[in-house]
């Protein structure tokens, strides 16, 4: 009986009641059919739309980034129509864009990509991908003007490369999988060769699936000492900020890094953010100077006291200070989103007891390079003649990136490989206007192979020292104007150095005309730079 009642109830959902007019019965059936048909159509359209979105967003099997257009045919105000990539058979071969023959002193290194089980301290250990068994890998210390030769040996089970972040290498040594080389396969060796032209703090990391590989340990630092130094540092230490399993680590370890220094000595801390997200930091115990940004000296830096600094993905800060008579100097850090600095210092310089009872506030005005230091004459200014100016709008949407549903980060409304391409002619002075008008996060935009001169922040000219960067961080509702000389022919990436954003579309190319490459990005080649 119970089963019979259930059956009757189910039938009553679509069956007419006894005595109901025939017309009403037919109308009811039609209505049910229409509803079912509508639901079916909706599911087919939605499913088809999702399927089309996933399919159409996938990278082609092969994307060649070579260029084959003539500058005379290009409209310099329109990025989208300037030049078509995809010709690998004509033009200057990218492999010929190498460091010149030189009698300079040679520094030779071997970096072996290999797996390792690493201890990060405080009972934390994990499998990692490393250079020479450590993460960060060895710090490469060279002198300005030296010829640097690095042999990459791959003992991992997948392809890797090395990109020299911030160093103006020739294009063949840029280390971008699918653009300047194929990823180095397991068991293979590849050699990079470049001149260390500019003194400063730089770093290196894999640019094959860089979001995954850099995050899992394939990175290290490069220090280029100047031929003639204008200042003397008694203590000089490089420090790599990174995150492992959501825990901040410094030079591959949790806890406090201890650095020896005596009263009256000058100390330089070279801070490198190898992570995707910002770190907030400050020094307590003595006033400090911001001596350099992205490896380039600040003119006339002035003392700061416990001022917060924000260092975004890929950026570098050189901090200098003189050790006080009494007590240590502490570097405090906070991850983005933290309400205060960690009570345990990240770095402790000198002897004595550190007291954390009065942590400086994260809410006070943070360091602003646009007003820091002393003005001086610079080769590039707002009054310079610019051969071309381009606006790059940084955005965000929900959609598909290479077949994956989720966030998509865009440049002028498009994501890689459909993002706009800028073609520049050797000798031109190029102006870029970056704007972040959406709440799409912080975008540290990194240009390979060139140095950016910052002209304006939010429409206002810089009032302090000239600022030269390779990674310009654009926060929500900020804008910057920057400029660079097109003096390094090749095919160069411009991308967000939050590598998650780059991995989800925030990449574009700045290329010179008539450059050919035998390499390609995509499934057929196995090259995926981000």
Predicted regions and their residues:
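Histidine- and aromatic-rich segments of cupredoxin/plastocyanin-like copper-binding domains
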Residues: 173-174, 183-185, 232, 238-371, ...
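Histidine- and aromatic-enriched segments that form or immediately flank copper-ligand environments
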Residues: 30-33, 50, 109-229, 278-309, ...
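N-terminal, post-signal-peptide metal-ligating segments of extracellular/periplasmic oxidoreductases
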Residues: 2-189, 224-225, 230-267, 308, ...
């Amino acid at each position: 009986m119970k089963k019979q009642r259930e059956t009757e109830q189910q039938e009553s959902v679509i069956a007419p009641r006894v005595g109901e007019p025939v017309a009403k019965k037919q109308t009811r059936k039609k209505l049910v059919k229409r509803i079912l048909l509508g639901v079916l159509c909706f599911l087919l359209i939605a499913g088809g739309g999702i399927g089309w979105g996933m399919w159409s967003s996938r990278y082609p099997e092969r994307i060649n980034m070579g260029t084959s257009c003539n500058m005379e045919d290009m409209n310099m105000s329109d990025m989208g129509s300037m030049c078509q990539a995809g010709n690998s058979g004509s033009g200057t071969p990218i492999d010929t864009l190498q460091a010149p023959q030189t009698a300079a002193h040679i520094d030779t290194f071997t970096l072996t990509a290999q797996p390792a089980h690493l201890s990060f301290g405080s009972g934390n250990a994990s499998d990692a991908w490393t250079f020479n068994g450590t993460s960060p890998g060895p710090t490469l210390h060279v002198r300005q003007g030296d010829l640097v030769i690095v042999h990459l040996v791959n003992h991992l089970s997948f392809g890797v490369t090395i990109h020299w972040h911030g160093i103006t290498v020739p294009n063949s040594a840029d280390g971008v999988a699918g653009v300047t080389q194929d990823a180095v396969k397991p068991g293979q060796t590849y050699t990079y060769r470049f001149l260390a032209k500019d003194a400063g703090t730089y770093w290196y990391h894999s640019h094959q699936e860089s979001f995954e590989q850099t995050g899992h340990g394939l990175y290290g630092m490069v220090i280029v000492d100047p031929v003639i130094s204008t200042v003397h540092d008694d203590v000089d230490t490089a420090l790599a900020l990174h995150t492992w399993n959501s825990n901040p680590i410094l030079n591959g370890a949790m806890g406090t890094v201890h650095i020896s220094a005596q009263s009256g000595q000058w100390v330089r801390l070279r801070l490198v953010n190898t992570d995707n997200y910002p770190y907030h930091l400050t020094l307590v115990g003595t006033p400090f100077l911001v001596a350099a940004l992205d490896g380039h000296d600040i003119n006339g830096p002035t003392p700061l006291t416990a001022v917060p600094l924000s260092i975004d993905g890929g950026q570098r800060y050189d901090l200098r200070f003189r050790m006080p008579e009494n007590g240590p100097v502490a570097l405090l850090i906070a991850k983005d989103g933290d309400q205060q600095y960690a009570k345990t210092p990240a770095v402790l310089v000198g002897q004595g007891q550190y007291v954390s009872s009065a942590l400086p506030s994260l809410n006070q005005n943070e360091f602003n390079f646009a007003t820091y230091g002393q003005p001086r004459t610079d080769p590039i200014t707002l009054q310079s003649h610019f051969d071309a100016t381009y606006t790059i709008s940084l955005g965000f949407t929900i959609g598909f990136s290479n077949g994956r549903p989720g966030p998509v980060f865009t440049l002028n409304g498009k994501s890689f490989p459909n993002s706009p391409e800028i073609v520049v002619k050797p000798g031109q002075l190029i102006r870029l206007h970056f704007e972040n008008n959406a709440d799409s996060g912080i975008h540290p935009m990194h240009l390979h192979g060139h140095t950016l001169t910052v002209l304006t922040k939010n429409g206002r000219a810089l009032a302090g020292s000239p600022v030269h960067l390779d990674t310009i961080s654009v926060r929500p509702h900020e804008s910057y104007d920057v400029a660079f000389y097109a003096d390094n022919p090749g095919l160069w990436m411009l991308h967000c150095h939050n590598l998650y954003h780059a991995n989800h579309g925030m990449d574009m190319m700045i290329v010179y005309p008539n450059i050919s490459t035998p390499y390609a990005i995509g499934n057929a080649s196995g090259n995926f730079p981000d």
